[in-house]
A protein has these predicted regions:
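Acidic/His/Gly-enriched intrinsically disordered linker/tail segments
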Residues: 88-95, 109, 127-259
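Short, strongly hydrophobic alpha-helical membrane anchors
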Residues: 6-7
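N-terminal signal peptide c-region/cleavage motif recognized by signal peptidases
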Residues: 10-14
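N-terminal export leaders
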Residues: 1-2
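Juxtacatalytic substrate-recognition/specificity segment
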Residues: 17-132, 226-230
């Protein structure tokens, strides 16, 4: 990938790379990666194809031509002031056809954040109305997890994803989780939401299979979506037992790790 894109690099007057064009998915996706002068783009460029493949396996490929701007940022000043309180290893935010990324220093956390936001971007491209909140974030968590797992294998590292702190006291029921319209505000409650959203998305993908799961995403990602439970019952013949099974999948069993 890097060799193929070698002729697509722009240079500043000092010879420092500031922008690189990467083409993915058989040239159906063009990604313009930009960064301040002197930035080492190698970690991002090594991770980008892995993260994009992980996201595409979940959501599918957007209609070409698809263009994405990936802006690599230095750590903002407020993080320097708060460094004594907490350490952010990587963060990113997707808005339209742009992702702003601070890659940090941990390659697995970079892979997770990039996979998470690329999944959001692919959902935005394929389903502009967006799925329900729980599914939107559950998919993004799946994409991030898959990217981190692949990156861990390429680096021959172990990927540890322990359960969130205080999970047991902040869990949602299935009805509560799928009824959320806004993000939880408390940190422990938010961590439970993301964990459970990923667990529910994983359970549905396992039960439906990858192709039917993508069909499910499309059917609920419309301006006036059907009740997802009725949809599962009528199209995929889910029974009361199946719904109870789903409810159990978002509750951590003894010794169970991150989904």
């Amino acid at each position: 990938m890097l060799a193929a894109a070698a002729g697509l690099i722009s240079f500043s007057a000092s010879g420092t790379p500031v922008c690189q064009t990467v083409r993915l998915a058989d040239d159906r996706i063009t990604c313009e990666v930009s960064a301040p002068p002197g930035t080492d783009l190698a970690p991002v460029l090594d991770t980008l194809p892995i993260a994009m493949r992980s996201a595409m396996e979940l959501v599918g490929v957007p209609e070409p031509p698809a263009h994405l701007a990936l802006q690599v940022l230095p750590p903002p000043s407020f993080l320097k002031r708060l460094k004594a309180l907490f350490q952010v290893d990587a963060f990113a935010m997707q808005a339209g056809d742009e992702i702003r990324l601070y890659p940090g220093r941990e390659p697995l956390k970079l892979a997770f954040r990039l996979g998470h936001e690329l999944t959001h971007w692919l959902v935005y491209k394929r389903h502009p109305a967006r799925p329900p909140l729980w599914l939107d974030e559950g998919l993004a968590q799946q994409g991030g997890s898959a990217a981190a797992e692949v990156r861990a294998r390429t680096l021959k590292q172990d990927l540890a994803r322990p359960l969130p702190d205080q999970l047991a006291g902040n869990l949602f029921t299935l009805e509560e989780l799928t009824g959320l319209r806004d993000y939880p505000r408390r940190a422990a409650r938010s961590a439970a939401f993301y964990w459970q959203a990923e667990a529910l998305a994983n359970a549905l993908r396992r039960r439906l299979g990858p192709g039917e799961f993508q069909a499910f995403i499309g059917l609920v990602s419309v301006p006036q979506p059907p009740d997802w439970r009725v949809l599962l019952r009528e199209r995929w013949y889910f029974s009361d037992w199946d719904m109870d099974w789903l409810a159990g999948q978002i509750q951590p069993a003894a010794g169970r790790k991150q989904p």
